[in-house]
Amino acid sequence: MAAAKHFTYVILGGGVAAGYAAREFAKQGVKPGELAIISKESVAPYERPALSKGYLFPQNAARLPGFHTCVGSGGERLLPEWYSEKGIELILSTEIVKADLASKTLTSSADATFTYDTLLIATGSSVIKLTDFGVQGAEANDILYLRDIEDADKLVAAMQAKKDGKAVIVGGGYIGLELSAALKTNNFDVTMVYPEPWCMPRLFTSGLAAFYEGYYANKGIHIIKGTVAVGFDADANGDVTAVKLKNGNVLEADIVIVGVGGRPLTHLFKGQVAEEKGGIKTDAFFETSVPGVYAIADVAAFPMKLYNEIRRVEHVDHARKSAEQAVKAIKAKEAGESVPEYDYLPYFYSRSFDLSWQFYGDNVGEDVLFGDNDPTAAKPKFGSYWIKDGKVVGVFLEGGSAEENQVIAKVARAQPPVADVEALKKEGLDFAAKV
């Protein structure tokens, strides 16, 4: 076996967080040969949200190298050449199958070994597949998932092969809503199926969801709620032809896209680090219970200062910010200095069709819907406040300008008191503007 390759710093994972961590290391003056990124993917880190949005456009679709990190936040695009110039080693198409934190050694599926002084775990999440639950027929062709660029390429190929066909989207969350819009824009006949009483149940109230379901229905998307896919039919070639639902219905399908959630990829570290909330427990600097080992983005269960509790956040904004925080903390520690604790304000957003919403804060407590949430409105603009213990703790806004979105973020952070809920409903966005 070849000798282990040693690096001062290793980032394990090649997603959004890896790209932002590499940029921060470069800013902090990392020396050539000190840093490596080890990734299962075959390309340099890229902005993952593009896969469910621009990548699927019928015209002028986004393609690499156009959306390598860090363009998603208005930063420099880090092409593979950038890593070479900085002396950062990109070790791609490499799957790590064993991590021994005691000996600071990583082993790949090809039996290559890598050692490090400091490790950043940025392994992200894997998609939950219907085959994991033994759903009958779930291994048929053109039952697709979306997590990485390889998945996106399979989806694009299927869309071209099954042009103007029937698409069934299983799941009513982020991926379900964004991909239903993408497939409809590509002239597919689209049906969404999900078990919950409304879409995006982890964030949306029934009032918010009613707008999006109405809007999608007006676009010709069929929505079937309160049931799940229990089986699939395929033709002699193994291509999917139908989706069988628990309620007895059978839907014709040329393509099925499944978006039923993800699981943080922490299995390599089981029994070696403290865990919480399904992730790897860290402090406010993203250091784990093992000194010199950090966990960022999807896998980190970190102290959310604003709400005084440990949380895990699966979102690109947190992936970027946690990566930067961890690298700053690593370099500060080496210099005998300190950095402020991570103080994250939860943020989610989505764009589909002509719609664009943003949410900041916490969606707990009483919700107060404001504005016009008529799905037939030419330019819909509405939102919701969440009130807990007499204070605004979360704000959602559809159709906001950049300035208005900044205002709602400020409100979610400031948590102003609310004396009169009815007055708040009438004031709507004006309340936020006064904070």
UniProtKB/Swiss-Prot annotation:
Keyword terms, alphabetized: Cytoplasm, FAD, Flavoprotein, NAD, NADP, Oxidoreductase, Redox-active center
Localization, UniProt: Cytoplasm
Binding residue positions for NADP(+): 174-178, 202, 261, 314-315, 349
Catalytic activity reported: 2 monodehydro-L-ascorbate radical + NADH + H(+) = 2 L-ascorbate + NAD(+)
Essential cofactor(s): FAD
Residues given in the record as L-ascorbate binding sites: 320, 351
Principal cellular location given in the protein's record: cytoplasm
Annotated residues for binding of FAD: 14-17, 41, 48, 53, 96, 147-148, 298, 316, 349
Family classification: Belongs to the FAD-dependent oxidoreductase family.
Protein known as: Monodehydroascorbate reductase 4, cytosolic
